[in-house]
Amino acid sequence: MPASPLAPARGRWLVPALIVVVSLTVGGGLLAREVYRKPDAAADTGVIATRTSQSLAPEQQPGSPVVEMTPDAAAHPHADGVRALLQNYFDAINARNYELWKTTVTKLRAQAKSKVEWEADYRSTKDGSILVYRIEAMGDGTLQSLIGFTSTQDPQDGPVDLQEPCVRWHLTLPMVLENGMWKLDAIPAGTTPMHERCT
């Protein structure tokens, strides 16, 4: 007879034990879903692992005008500010908006390029497939961003040594703080950005 009082006790522990097991299973499933969804979430924030412009058909060039970053660049403390600055810079070029462009560069650089000159330089340019590979903080408090992008333009508006309708660029852009805001500085004299014909 002593076995019968124990039976209800076992039944009482079975329900809470099942609740714990089910809760852990559901929680584990939700956690796994979040872990496996992280790449998609990263893509939504403009972080990508590889450059895709090489696979675009000629009529799709220059590709998306949205500035994207590698995971390495996106991990930099100034990534959001750099992305916003570059987005405004390329938006200004694509929209032929000189006034917006002036807000993205240093005062000295803006003064060195008149509106007439700027509009002539970018009259047929469209930029896309913009990828920030790396952001580096320099010892003097400035930043350097290693970027790649594609430009399409009338061939006569391309670089003097590569007058092509589609050019792929790789360059390092210097950025300085001016009145508390990051601005694009002039590329040092004598520096030649790497560029090649789109393939």
Model-found features: residue ranges?
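Exposed beta-sheet edge and beta->alpha loop/turn motif
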Residues: 3-19, 23-43, 142-199
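Compositionally biased regions
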Residues: 5, 24, 54-56, 115
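N-terminal low-complexity, Pro/Thr-rich disordered segments
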Residues: 31, 36-77, 192-198
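Residue-identity detector for glutamine
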Residues: 54, 60-61, 87, 111, ...
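Core segments of small alpha/beta cavity-forming domains
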Residues: 59-123
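Short structured motifs
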Residues: 86, 129-133, 170
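Short solvent-exposed beta->alpha transition segments
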Residues: 98-146, 153-157
